[in-house]
Structure formats: structure tokens, C-alpha cells
Amino acid sequence: MAASVVCRAATAGAQVLLRARRSPALLRTPALRSTATFAQALQFVPETQVSLLDNGLRVASEQSSQPTCTVGVWIDVGSRFETEKNNGAGYFLEHLAFKGTKNRPGSALEKEVESMGAHLNAYSTREHTAYYIKALSKDLPKAVELLGDIVQNCSLEDSQIEKERDVILREMQENDASMRDVVFNYLHATAFQGTPLAQAVEGPSENVRKLSRADLTEYLSTHYKAPRMVLAAAGGVEHQQLLDLAQKHLGGIPWTYAEDAVPTLTPCRFTGSEIRHRDDALPFAHVAIAVEGPGWASPDNVALQVANAIIGHYDCTYGGGVHLSSPLASGAVANKLCQSFQTFSICYAETGLLGAHFVCDRMKIDDMMFVLQGQWMRLCTSATESEVARGKNILRNALVSHLDGTTPVCEDIGRSLLTYGRRIPLAEWESRIAEVDASVVREICSKYIYDQCPAVAGYGPIEQLPDYNRIRSGMFWLRF
């Protein structure tokens, strides 16, 4: 009996293949394909739906079959919108958001979140602020209600402000122990000196000690406006339900400004410069070097991300040794140049930072800087098709793996609508990546890196960090 079943199955399969040979179109149907290309697979990614409330607040969602969801409010405000006087106000408000609202004391807010088994979080950057909740899909109505209450009705009680002031000051002391965070704050301070982007998200400790309830109230009334907000959700959510909940709980957020005092985004200039903080008591030197990169909307971003993928990243705990695909990584292993390095591309509205950060022994700083700049110059002058193909595949993998889960997808939706005005589909990103070849990488790298003045930040035992003029001379090659 079993043999006859197998025989009939084989006969049926042969008949299908025979029909496919006669009609090649059959081979293009998903049922007869064993695999789909990367570009074809991206066509089946769920669509992002976007709607607009009457007050200008945008509502966006991506529905999937997951039993959980992440929903959050992304706001177009960060430390670059602050002044020297109120720098740190946004970070302060982020902390106060969990301490209760006018409708819910802090203990009641915590109990409601815990009773759902949900996770409530928030973060601030130089351009954006976000509040989000990850919960079961059935708890979406309660999650949106809580977010609406947090964004609109923060209690700002004097006792909570004083208590949180001490918490933030302790956090700032802990952050100072993170050498990487310190170096990147130094890098922004020197690269964008004299502009709002130089300001740290946390603000200076003097401001944290002086910020008052009136300062925080003014910050809220100035920046928390509906047209600058996005309610984003991902996972097991229905867009119409989300839209109805947004109208109910966020539809009352104001959209007008007193006396038309609309905040404007101050353009930030890049300055090639350096900042050095020498501390020989520390075991390793942390150094960051960057040139001015493009803003969010620039078409050059994809080619520069491919270039960063070619240079790659490295940590001494990695396996592979000298067989790593990145020439800089294999060289770092062979010559014991560093403990770790990573490339980065930090984008803002109209500018950015494109560079690398490395951690190394005090006697290897000069060598590591020389090799890193040599790799930059090689990309500008002689990037090859094979390494560009490798960089494109690395970027494709990062693009997809970054969106694994409802929280990363929700964050991508919220940030994309604030920066691009829309969510760029993965298929469109793939087409942009596919257009990059070696000539494009050489051209774009030459535009942003070759013979450009860098910003440099060093922290730790950095006596051997080369003089700025030497570093600047490493940004070009004499060619005949």
C-alpha cells in the first residue's frame, strides 16, 4: 500500500514537471520555487499603514500575526532643540514620565503596567524622544490610554522633581564611567562646537541642579505638539482600532503655538577640530575620529553604509583571527593593534558624523590611526567590486536582522516618519543597495572623506595620539 502511494506521488510530480517544461510561467509560481531571492522575499513584508488625525498627529502601524505588540509615541524633540539654559530638560521629563500623572500616581501607574505583564520604557536622543510599551495584543487599548496620559498629563510635582534630580545626578556619574559614552559626547562637543548638537542629552550637572517646574512646564508646552508626534505600533494590531484609540486618547493634544512662536531647527555646522582628555591611570585609550556625514534624507547614505560595512568592526573576543574578511580587522589581529574598533554613521536632520571608534593600548594609538586612515584612503581610491559585494551583503543582513521583533519595527516606524516623512519599504532599500558598485563607493567616499578635516576625540592614556596636523595629513595621499 505504501509503495503504491509513493508511486502515485512520483507520477504526479513528473506530470507537474512536464507541464512546467511546456509552460515556463508555471516555474515562476511560488508553489514550484524551492527558494525566493532576497528582493522577492521583501515584497511580502507587511505594509505600513499611515493615517492623520485632525490635530496633525500621525498614526502608523504594521500588522503581523504575533500575539504581542509594541506601541509608542515618538516626538520630534531632543537636546538640539534646547538652549544652554534648559539643556537636559527633555531627559529630565523622560525620567518624570514614570513617576505618575495627574490622573495616576506613580504606584498606580506601575501596578497597571505590571498587571498587564507589559514593559514600559522611554529614551531621548539629540533629535527625538520616545515613550513605548510592549504588551499583549489584547492590551493595546490600555497601552494607548497609558501613553496618552503620560504624554499629556505628567504631574511634575515638586517632591518628585527633587527626588528625580538626585537620581539623574547619580546616573550622570555612572555614565562618566563609560568611556565610550564620554568619547562620543566629546566628539559631538568638538565637531559641532557652538551649535545645539554639541549639547549632551543629559545636559550639564549645573542645569540638572537648577531646572525648575516652570522650566519643565514651558518645555512641554513648547515642544509636545501633535504635528511633531507619531503614534506607531507593530505586531498584533489592527490599524483602524489603533486609529480610533489615538483619536480618543491623543486627539486632544494641541497643535497651535502661542503667538505663532513655532520652534525652528537651528542649522548646525561641522568644525574640524579635536578634544583630548588625558588620564594615564586608565588601562586603554578610547579614540574617535569622524568627518562630516550626510543628513538622514541624503541619497549618499547607502554607499557610505556599504563603505562602513567593508571596514567592518572587531573585538578581541572574536574568533577567526587573521582570516577575518575586513582588512582592518585582520591587520588589527596580526599586529595586535587594538582591543576593538567599530565604524559608525550618525545622521541628523541636515548633517551627521561618519567615522570610527577604537580602543587600544597606549603604545598602539599611532599605528592604529595610521592603518585606519589608510583603509579610508584605499576606499576612496581603489575599492574593489568583490569587497563592495561583501559590504552590500553585510548591509542587507543588518537591515533585515535589525527589524527582528515588534519593538525594533515600531521604533523604525516612528523614527522613519519623523526623519523621512514616510516609512521606506525594505524593497526600496534593497533597490538602493543594489545600485551601489565600486565606482559609486569610490566617488562618495572621496566626496565625504578624502582631504576633509576630521573631528577627533581622545580619552585615557593618549600621549601617543598624533598631533592634529599629522592626522589631517593622513586624510589624503600624494598621487602622481
Swiss-Prot record:
The modification Phosphoserine is found at S212. The modification N6-acetyllysine is found at K111, K138, K163, K248. The modification N6-succinyllysine is found at K163. Its main location: mitochondrion. Expressed in brain, including substantia nigra, striatum, cortex and cerebellum, and in spinal cord, heart, kidney, liver and muscle. Residues 1-34 form a transit peptide. One of its GO terms (biological process) is cellular respiration. Pfam families: Peptidase_M16 (PF00675), Peptidase_M16_C (PF05193). It is a peripheral membrane protein. Keywords: Acetylation, Disease variant, Electron transport, Membrane, Mitochondrion, Mitochondrion inner membrane, Neuropathy, Parkinsonism, Phosphoprotein, Respiratory chain, Transit peptide, Transport. It is found in: Mitochondrion inner membrane. Component of the ubiquinol-cytochrome c oxidoreductase (cytochrome b-c1 complex, complex III, CIII), a multisubunit enzyme composed of 11 subunits. The complex is composed of 3 respiratory subunits cytochrome b, cytochrome c1 and Rieske protein UQCRFS1, 2 core protein subunits UQCRC1/QCR1 and UQCRC2/QCR2, and 6 low-molecular weight protein subunits UQCRH/QCR6, UQCRB/QCR7, UQCRQ/QCR8, UQCR10/QCR9, UQCR11/QCR10 and subunit 9, the cleavage product of Rieske protein UQCRFS1. It is linked to Parkinsonism with polyneuropathy: An autosomal dominant disorder characterized by late-onset, levodopa-responsive parkinsonism with asymmetric tremor, rigidity and bradykinesia. Patients also manifest a sensorimotor polyneuropathy with variable degrees of distal legs and hands muscle atrophy and weakness, and absent deep tendon reflexes. Belongs to the peptidase M16 family. UQCRC1/QCR1 subfamily. This is Cytochrome b-c1 complex subunit 1, mitochondrial.
